[in-house]
Amino acid sequence: MSTAAVPELKQISRVEAMRLGPGWSHSCHAMLYAANPGQLFGRIPMRFSVLMQMRFDGLLGFPGGFVDRRFWSLEDGLNRVLGLGLGCLRLTEADYLSSHLTEGPHRVVAHLYARQLTLEQLHAVEISAVHSRDHGLEVLGLVRVPLYTQKDRVGGFPNFLSNAFVSTAKCQLLFALKVLNMMPEEKLVEALAAATEKQKKALEKLLPASS
């Protein structure tokens, strides 16, 4: 049985986050998703479509960015960034999902917002994003997260988790899928274990054989 577990960051409340001193930076990101009744190849349930994006640095993340609390509320700052990368969406405090403290030398609190759209609305966001100011610059394109696992137990979500993610994005994705009941925790653990094993094997192939 796999010993892999869903990684977790230190969660704090929104009120606690707002009380943090000026030495802390605030990042705000949005997870947009929609129920998807479709089937891949006519047999693999899609279940949900979740949007992430490929960034300028080659890392995957959610739409959003840093918010200067001296000039903007969390939501106003987030909407300003979303306007540059998506072009046609405004989130509110009602969409707030969580705040987590990041690990490492930089003092950053990461806020995540989540909004469920219809599949048609989600597709409209994808179309609008192509015409946004940051498309092809800071944002290289939106991607849908494959929330299924194929028969080989690697294709789909495990392969997706093998990609490189920016900062807290991977942990935020797993957290949101869990708390929004979009994927059972045991399925998250299985996908993580498969992704870790794949990465381990890939690394072993790159390393020279020991003499």
From Swiss-Prot:
UniProt main location, coarse: nucleus
Keyword check for Ribonucleoprotein, yes or no. no
| InterPro entries cross-referenced by the UniProt entry | NUDIX_hydrolase-like_dom_sf (IPR015797), NudT16 (IPR054754)
Q: Where in the cell is it found?
A: Nucleus
* Cross-link Glycyl lysine isopeptide (Lys-Gly) (interchain with G-Cter in ubiquitin) residue location(s): 10, 151
MF terms (GO), sorted A to Z: RNA binding; snoRNA binding
Q: Which PANTHER family match?
A: NUDIX T16 FAMILY MEMBER, TUDOR-INTERACTING REPAIR REGULATOR PROTEIN
Q: Which family does it belong to?
A: Belongs to the Nudix hydrolase family. TIRR subfamily.
User: What role does it play?
Assistant: Key regulator of TP53BP1 required to stabilize TP53BP1 and regulate its recruitment to chromatin. In absence of DNA damage, interacts with the tandem Tudor-like domain of TP53BP1, masking the region that binds histone H4 dimethylated at 'Lys-20' (H4K20me2), thereby preventing TP53BP1 recruitment to chromatin and maintaining TP53BP1 localization to the nucleus.
Q: What is the protein named?
A: Tudor-interacting repair regulator protein
